[in-house]
């Protein structure tokens, strides 16, 4: 089956991705690598979920994530570095892939930021 997992680079999402891949499924991971958590941790989560070495040379967020997208792409896995609030990007993903199951795990974390930026959390 083809799974789309939002938030697939987070703690819970990356573990789900790992199990889905082990069970032979195709996984599309959509994650925006929000700054609440260190993006380097999410890169390591992603690498572990696709059974790749976590030895990764970090430079800067944008280039590191682009490198991760290319490095992890396979016949069973693809990572999209995008925000689920970007309707056009999501529409393109749905257009390009036959998705059987969507697992929505993406969420903005943190109580304090939710008070400071409530609209971001509502969207």
Regions found by a protein language model. Name each.
Residues 1-123:
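N-terminal Rossmann-like NAD(P)+-binding domain of SDR-like oxidoreductases, especially those catalyzing
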